[in-house]
């Protein structure tokens, strides 16, 4: 799948050709995870509404939930003001984190709210 040239022109990729993808749960607003996307992963996500990312360690695309069943249906995708990150709003099925937790940010609180 090929990324729309108008979208591709707005992206500011890192040296590896990737942009940061921040994933937020629709409804709760929870930040679920942060991942990477190359042009092909973003194009596939936009065309199928299946969250697709790029694994730096495996050097390949992966569809969230293809193995685990913990899928992400993409409700919307937004580009940030600098063009170097996208925000995906998703409907999450199962845990978003590879540990099985709902969010990758469930593990350690470094600073508690000061309510």
Curated annotation (Swiss-Prot):
What does the UniProt function comment say about this protein?
Catalyzes the hydrolysis of the adenine ring of phosphoribosyl-AMP.
Please tell me the species this chain comes from: Mycobacterium tuberculosis (strain ATCC 25177 / H37Ra)
Subcellular location as annotated: Cytoplasm
> What does the record give as the organism's lineage?
Bacteria, Bacillati, Actinomycetota, Actinomycetes, Mycobacteriales
The record, for PANTHER family, names: HISTIDINE BIOSYNTHESIS BIFUNCTIONAL PROTEIN (PTHR42945), PHOSPHORIBOSYL-AMP CYCLOHYDROLASE (PTHR42945:SF11)
Family, according to the entry, reads as follows: Belongs to the PRA-CH family.
Q: Which UniProt keywords apply?
A: Amino-acid biosynthesis, Cytoplasm, Histidine biosynthesis, Hydrolase, Magnesium, Metal-binding, Zinc
Q: Which superkingdom is the protein from?
A: Bacteria
Per its UniProt record, the required cofactor names are: Mg(2+); Zn(2+)
**Keyword Plastid among record annotations:** no
| Enzyme Commission numbers on file | 3.5.4.19
Catalyzed reaction equations: 1-(5-phospho-beta-D-ribosyl)-5'-AMP + H2O = 1-(5-phospho-beta-D-ribosyl)-5-[(5-phospho-beta-D-ribosylamino)methylideneamino]imidazole-4-carboxamide
Q: Name one GO cellular component term.
A: cytoplasm
Q: Where does Mg(2+) bind?
A: 80, 82, 84
- Description of how the protein assembles with itself and partners: Homodimer.
On cofactor binding, the record's note says: Binds 1 Mg(2+) ion per subunit. Binds 1 zinc ion per subunit.
Residues where Zn(2+) binds = 81, 97, 104
Protein's pathway:
Amino-acid biosynthesis; L-histidine biosynthesis; L-histidine from 5-phospho-alpha-D-ribose 1-diphosphate: step 3/9
Gene Ontology biological process terms in this record: L-histidine biosynthetic process
For this entry, the protein name equals Phosphoribosyl-AMP cyclohydrolase
Per its record, what are the GO molecular function terms?
A: magnesium ion binding; phosphoribosyl-AMP cyclohydrolase activity; zinc ion binding
Q: EC class of this enzyme?
A: hydrolase
Q: Which Pfam families match?
A: PRA-CH
């Amino acid at each position: 799948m090929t990324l729309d040239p108008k979208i591709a022109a707005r992206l500011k990729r890192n040296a590896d050709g990737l942009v940061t993808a921040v994933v937020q749960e629709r409804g709760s607003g929870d930040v679920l995870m942060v991942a990477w996307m190359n042009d092909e992963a973003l194009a596939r996500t936009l065309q199928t509404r299946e969250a697709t990312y790029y694994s730096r360690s495996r050097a390949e695309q992966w569809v969230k939930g293809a193995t685990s069943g913990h899928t992400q249906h993409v409700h919307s995708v937004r580009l940030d003001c600098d063009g170097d990150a996208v925000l995906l709003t998703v409907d999450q099925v199962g845990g978003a984190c590879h540990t099985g937790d709902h969010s990758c940010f469930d593990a350690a609180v470094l600073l508690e709210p000061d309510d």
